[in-house]
């Protein structure tokens, strides 16, 4: 069946055989057979796999074997239906990338700040170092999506306010606070940009974007920011493979929760429409609760 039509490797065929045998054993224990099993039996089997500790990816592989099997039975006229059609695939648990420590983020920011203060060989190079420092300070201060960050309007920096208004997914606006460090970096960047652009256009800044570029969008791109961030990480002595703008957004949320922020507040800052999206960070809350119990419970130390 599978080998004839798909040229499957020997190991793959052996895996499918074991998966089908395991399901056949479950079906037999529940009063049916491999050939006669219905949708309810297959759904119950997935529940049994969960109870036995199988990961969602392993369950999905076994369901795939069953789908192939019943698809061929139906196509060959050996069954009048395919009982797997109504079975939902197991959902994989949302996972977070490795959370950067506060120390790693601090090292990254200090490296960017030092490079911004040193400047570059040309005014344009100096502006690029200011831009990268500002991007990092604003990202870690606000937790913006990278698409929101690179498309900030110039007006966000000119108001010099403690809050900036961000247009997020679906055009929904939210106000997020800026840290003093982010405001300082932003002012220094805008001043350097004014000096560079003003010399070319009689004091006027030509772009409405805070981080302009010559590309089609008119503003700095996510890809360019990610590239510059990885290069900075290498110069700071960090593993570039662990760094991305999205990882810094995760660090923002995780560090807030580690320091006692409410999950609902973090939801609002991140711009999540549904609290369930923010709940992927509950592992941070679990760790904080465990530390609190160990620190304050009278028997936590085993005495």
Kindly give the residue locations of the regions a language model identified.
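Conserved catalytic core of the tyrosine transesterase superfamily
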Residues: 1-303
């Amino acid at each position: 069946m599978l080998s004839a039509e798909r040229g499957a490797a020997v190991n793959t065929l052996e895996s499918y055989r074991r998966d089908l045998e395991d399901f056949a054993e479950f079906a037999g224990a529940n009063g049916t057979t491999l050939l006669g099993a219905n949708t309810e039996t297959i759904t119950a089997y997935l529940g049994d796999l969960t109870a036995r500790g199988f990961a969602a990816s392993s369950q999905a592989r076994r369901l795939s074997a069953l789908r192939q099997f019943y698809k061929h039975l139906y196509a060959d006229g050996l069954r009048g239906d395919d009982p797997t059609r109504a079975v939902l695939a197991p959902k994989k648990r949302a996972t977070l990338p490795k959370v950067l420590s506060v120390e790693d983020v601090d090292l990254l920011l200090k490296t960017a700040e030092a490079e911004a203060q040193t400047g570059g060989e040309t005014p344009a190079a100096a502006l690029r170092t200011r831009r990268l420092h500002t991007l990092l300070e604003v990202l870690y201060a606000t937790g913006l999506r990278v698409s929101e960050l690179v498309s900030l309007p110039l007006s966000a920096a000119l108001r010099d306010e403690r809050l900036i208004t961000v247009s997020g997914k679906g055009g929904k606006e939210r106000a997020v606070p800026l840290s003093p460090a982010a405001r300082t970096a932003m002012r220094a960047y805008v001043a350097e940009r004014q000096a560079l652009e003003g010399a070319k256009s009689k004091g006027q800044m030509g772009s409405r974007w805070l981080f302009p570029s010559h590309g089609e969008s008119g503003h700095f791109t996510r890809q360019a920011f990610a590239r510059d961030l990885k290069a900075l990480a290498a110069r700071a002595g960090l593993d570039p493979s662990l760094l991305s703008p999205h990882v810094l957004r995760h660090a923002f949320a995780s560090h807030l929760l580690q320091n006692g922020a409410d999950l609902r507040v973090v939801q609002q800052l991140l711009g999540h429409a549904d609290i369930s999206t923010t709940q992927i960070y509950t592992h941070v809350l679990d760790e904080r609760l465990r530390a609190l119990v160990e620190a304050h419970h009278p028997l936590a130390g085993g005495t």
